[in-house]
Swiss-Prot record:
Transmembrane regions: 218-238
PANTHER family, A to Z: AND PUTATIVE PEPTIDOGLYCAN-BINDING DOMAIN-CONTAINING PROTEIN 4-RELATED, LYSM AND PUTATIVE PEPTIDOGLYCAN-BINDING DOMAIN-CONTAINING PROTEIN
PROSITE patterns: LYSM
Record Gene3D superfamilies: LysM domain
Name by which UniProt lists this protein: LysM and putative peptidoglycan-binding domain-containing protein 4
Any single GO CC term annotated in Swiss-Prot or TrEMBL for this entry: membrane
Residues of the LysM domain: 74-118
Domain of life: Eukaryota
Organism: Pongo abelii (Sumatran orangutan)
Extracellular side: 1-217
Gene: LYSMD4
Residues bearing attached sugar chains per UniProt: 30
Length: 296
């Protein structure tokens, strides 16, 4: 875009030309515009930072931020499930800061490293209590190791005490194993003795039955079938026949006769019926009327 803008501008000739014996100097009217363009071009320049082997060759450690004395770079080994977002949440920093410290262009550059540097605040929880993180050492610092050689007598006494402790420990383990084996053998022998002396109980008798007949004998089944198929239908027919006729056989039919005599009534097609006469008692009015008639 910058190149196109420069080409789109019209060419302006020099206003003043100064000649010298060795060169020609051209003076333009809009000199300030050229200086502005030059400053813009300088601002668009990109600063390249060394990465990987170039950073190791240079051997110069650049701090995370200029004048940021409260920031410390901590180095830790990467795991398979680590990511930039996880590291940023874990150490309380930004993803951009981690990428800037480790010279990452893309997030996939994380998987090319075995260890990563994380910017954290100095005198914080991570720098004081976290044992997994190690502070990044500057190349100029030197590590000094002090080794104290113990005395021969102390070393001999210490080794003898350790050896005696180990022997006691292994002896205790052997005794525990022997006790466990002996107890297991004793339990096995006692179980065998108890089972040999104990008489076997007879098996309970099983009642022969099938699932279909529920243990009913064959003659019981025959009796039930005769009862249901023959006897019950006969009683059913007799009962309804008697209810339909409305009369019982050999029943007596009695009738009242005024003279108090007894008569037998016969009806064709039916049995003879006996009629019993009931004597009638005359009332008092009828007797009074009879006496008055006799007096007249």
């Amino acid at each position: 875009m910058r190149h196109k803008e420069l080409l789109s501008k019209t060419f302006q000739g020099p206003a003043v030309v100064c000649r010298t014996p060795t060169s020609h100097v051209y003076m333009f009217k809009n000199g300030s515009g050229d200086s502005g363009d030059a400053s813009e071009e300088e601002s668009h320049r990109v600063v390249l930072r060394p990465r990987g082997k170039e950073l190791q060759k240079s051997g110069v450690h650049q701090p995370h931020q200029a004048g940021a004395g409260d920031v410390v770079l901590l180095q830790r080994e990467l795991a398979q499930e680590d990511s930039l977002n996880k590291l940023a949440l874990q150490y309380g920093c930004k993803v951009a800061d981690i990428k800037k410290v480790n010279n990452f262009i893309r997030e996939q550059d994380l998987y090319a490293l075995k260890s990563i540097k994380s910017p954290v605040k100095n005198h914080g929880i991570l720098t004081e209590t976290h044992k997994e993180l190690k502070p990044l050492l500057s190349p100029s610092s030197e590590t000094t190791v002090t080794v104290e050689l113990p005395d021969a007598d102390r070393a001999g006494a210490g080794t003898d005490a350790q050896a005696s402790q180990l022997m006691d420990f292994f002896k205790g383990i052997d005794q525990d194993i022997e006790c466990a084996v002996q107890s297991e053998i004793f339990l096995h022998e006692s179980y065998c003795i108890d089972t040999s002396h104990q008489p076997l109980l007879p098996a309970p008798p099983k009642t022969p039955m099938d699932g279909a007949d529920c243990g009913i004998q064959w003659w019981n089944a025959v009796f039930i079938m005769l009862l249901i198929g023959i006897v019950l239908p006969i009683f059913y027919l007799v009962y309804f026949k008697i209810q339909a006729s409305g009369e019982t056989p050999n029943s007596l039919n009695t009738a009242a006769i005024p003279n108090g005599s007894m008569a037998m009534g016969t009806v064709p097609g039916q049995a003879p019926r006996l009629a019993v006469a009931v004597p009638t008692v005359p009332s008092a009015d009828s007797q009074f009327s009879q006496t008055t008639q006799a007096g007249n």
